[in-house]
């Protein structure tokens, strides 16, 4: 991908996306994507207190996402947000390719586009949905019945 192609794609994609994702078990998880200051996309899911993963730091979560989890924080509504970024080894970092400066790193690799990051967010949401307290209760009751 050359500079012009990347510029066009970034302009077409925009800098953010938000949606509600309904997981295969019926749990609804809010997802979002934001472009960071280095122009790489970052994906996030929002967990409510109904999820047993609520408040647990990303280093302590056994969840898989592109490059591993790299973010956690409470949002303005006191929900727990966890996320990942697409600025890892083997990722094309848009800033380094589009910059006027000459960099020897970050210019090769694969650009992780909005569709890729959306898919990763939804995979992360599916994993986290298993820890919804309502799903955990349902599974326990199903084993008893």
Predicted regions and their residues:
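Eukaryotic compositionally biased low-complexity/IDR segments
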Residues: 1-4
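Polybasic, proline/glycine-rich intrinsically disordered low-complexity segments
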Residues: 6-27, 54-133
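Generic structural signal for residues positioned in beta-strands
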Residues: 32, 44, 81-85
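Intrinsically disordered, low-complexity regulatory segments in eukaryotic proteins
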Residues: 32-33, 134
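Acidic (Asp/Glu-rich) sequence patches and key acidic residues
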Residues: 34-52
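Short acidic, low-complexity intrinsically disordered linear motifs used
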Residues: 133-145
């Amino acid at each position: 991908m050359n500079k012009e192609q990347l510029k066009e794609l970034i302009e077409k994609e925009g800098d953010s996306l938000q949606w509600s994702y309904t997981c295969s078990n019926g749990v609804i998880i809010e997802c979002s994507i934001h472009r960071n200051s280095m122009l790489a996309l970052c994906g996030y899911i929002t967990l409510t207190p109904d999820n047993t993963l609520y408040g647990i730091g990303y280093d302590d979560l056994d969840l898989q996402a592109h490059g591993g989890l790299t973010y956690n924080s409470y949002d303005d509504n006191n929900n727990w947000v966890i996320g990942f970024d697409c600025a890892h080894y083997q990722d094309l970092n848009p800033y380094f390719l589009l910059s006027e400066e000459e960099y020897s790193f970050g210019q090769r690799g694969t650009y992780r586009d909005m569709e890729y990051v959306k898919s990763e967010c939804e995979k992360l949401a599916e994993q986290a949905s298993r820890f919804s307290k309502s799903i955990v209760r349902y599974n326990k009751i199903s084993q008893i019945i």
